[in-house]
């Protein structure tokens, strides 16, 4: 089939590349000419393991093209995916300006009967809006069918998830449209669930809200564990053995971030409010997450008595490992607070520094290695559990710091490892490791 994907952000590019990999001819449209030029050269605008390699392969094979022109990009499309951003407004609602713009451009340039599929995460009822806009502005006498197909990818493993996902959700009441999309997705060999459009829209929000709830729940349990002398790692493992609960998303830390959970939880609170339902549970999930991000700084302040003039090394900046995404990363909240307290901040991340420079305080000093960031610092804060950070030997902190003091927001080390290394170590939901003679 001939597929057009509007938007080459995280969702759009992964969608386009993956569909070309299973044999479809795909054109990705973006109005950013520089971005399109870079992708034509085989340079991905985002870091995602395996994405750039597949992009280059399918471009070379002639199945994947990049275009700035809607007229050219939509001319032969059998199916059009809308994968533009729906950023959060200041009041928590989703901003649908890019969605409505895409719908109007489709109406103006589409030349044949086409299925329009919304891949972007949109509030319930948005596909009705899209259908209305296209119908109102349609320039040619063609038939358009609108469907919902929410994405469930995890940044850092999006390519794997595309080919090994749990389900593909299709929202449409039209049998012909459903059959067309099932044929499109069949090569993925992933179970397909068809439902109505509004339920498909809600499935995405409900799924992300539930996962965010698990994260905030385990973080609240971790805070209690610290006070009663329990170990959150043991508690989470024991909980996860119950198949009704499952072990995923029971990793205590400094909270969630990224492009989905913060935006989607806030949007769902607004969706509920629009129908006069006070979503108290989800409001608490958001509040817990915001508090959790500040927790590590509180621990440092309690231990050091203040951070003014102190050198603090931040290890890991992206919101999670294996991505360069800085959106809503806990490192932003932590760096902002440290800067406001006049701390000297050094930072290391293997991938995300170029993006971090746009959102972290100007005073942050970036280092190319863990050693450079840690050497001579008064304290270290581990914010992202990148593999190289997790594998960095605790004993090395002894050589690099006069008084090794580590605040681990991702529980990268065991307590036994910290004890054996002789470092002062504070983690999440576990007792502190304090060597004899350490000043507290």
From Swiss-Prot:
Pfam families: UDPG_MGDP_dh, UDPG_MGDP_dh_C, UDPG_MGDP_dh_N
Keyword terms, alphabetized: Cell wall biogenesis/degradation, Cytoplasm, NAD, Oxidoreductase, Phosphoprotein
Alphabetical GO biological process terms: cell wall organization; polysaccharide biosynthetic process; UDP-glucuronate biosynthetic process
Disulfide partners: none
InterPro entries: 6-PGluconate_DH-like_C_sf, NAD(P)-bd_dom_sf, UDP-Glc/GDP-Man, UDP-Glc/GDP-Man_DH_C, UDP-Glc/GDP-Man_DH_C_sf, UDP-Glc/GDP-Man_DH_dimer, UDP-Glc/GDP-Man_DH_N, UDPglc_DH_bac
Control of this protein's activity: Competitively inhibited by UDP-glucose. Activated by phosphorylation, which may increase affinity for NAD(+); inhibited by dephosphorylation.
Family listed: Belongs to the UDP-glucose/GDP-mannose dehydrogenase family.
Protein name as annotated: UDP-glucose 6-dehydrogenase YwqF
Gene behind this protein: ywqF
């Amino acid at each position: 089939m001939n597929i057009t994907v509007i938007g080459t952000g995280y969702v759009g590019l992964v969608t386009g590349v993956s569909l070309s990999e299973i044999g479809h001819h795909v054109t990705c449209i973006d109005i950013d000419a520089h971005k399109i030029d870079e992708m034509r050269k085989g340079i991905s605008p985002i870091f995602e393991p395996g994405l750039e390699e597949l992009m280059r392969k399918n471009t070379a094979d002639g199945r994947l093209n990049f275009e700035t022109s809607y007229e050219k990009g939509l001319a032969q499309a059998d199916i059009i995916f809308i994968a533009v951003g729906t950023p959060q407004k200041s009041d928590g609602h989703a901003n649908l300006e890019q969605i409505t713009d895409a719908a109007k451009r489709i109406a103006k340039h589409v030349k044949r009967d086409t299925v329009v599929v919304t891949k972007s995460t949109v509030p319930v009822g948005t596909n009705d809006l899209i259908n209305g806009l296209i119908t109102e502005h349609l320039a040619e006498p063609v038939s358009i069918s609108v469907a919902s197909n929410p994405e469930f990818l995890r940044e850092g493993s999006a390519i794997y998830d595309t080919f090994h996902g749990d389900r593909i959700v299709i929202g449409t009441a039209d049998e012909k449209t459903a059959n067309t999309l099932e044929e499109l997705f069949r090569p993925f060999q992933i179970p397909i669930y068809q439902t109505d459009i509004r339920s498909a829209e809600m499935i995405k929000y409900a799924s992300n809200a539930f996962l965010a709830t698990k994260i905030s729940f385990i973080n609240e349990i971790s805070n209690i564990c610290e006070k009663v002398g329990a170990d959150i790692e043991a508690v989470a493992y024991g909980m996860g053995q119950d198949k009704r609960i499952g072990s995923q998303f029971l990793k205590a830390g400094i909270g969630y971030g990224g492009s989905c959970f913060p935006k989607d939880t806030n949007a769902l609170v607004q969706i509920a409010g629009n129908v006069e339902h006070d979503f108290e549970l989800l409001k608490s999930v958001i509040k817990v997450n915001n508090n959790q991000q500040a927790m590590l700084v509180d621990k440092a302040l309690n231990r050091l008595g203040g951070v003014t003039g102190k050198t603090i090394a931040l290890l890991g900046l992206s919101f999670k490992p294996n991505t360069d995404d800085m959106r809503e990363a806990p490192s932003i909240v932590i760096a902002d607070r440290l800067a406001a307290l006049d701390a000297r901040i050094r930072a290391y991340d293997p991938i995300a520094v170029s993006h971090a420079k746009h959102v972290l305080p100007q005073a942050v000093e970036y280092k190319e290695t863990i050693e450079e960031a840690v050497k001579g610092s008064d304290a270290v804060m581990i914010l992202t559990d990148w593999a190289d950070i997790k594998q960095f030997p605790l004993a090395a902190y002894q050589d690099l710091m006069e008084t090794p003091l580590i605040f681990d927001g991702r529980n990268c080390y065991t307590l036994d490892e910290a004890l054996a290394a002789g470092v002062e170590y504070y983690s999440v939901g576990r007792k502190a490791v304090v060597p004899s003679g350490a000043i507290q």
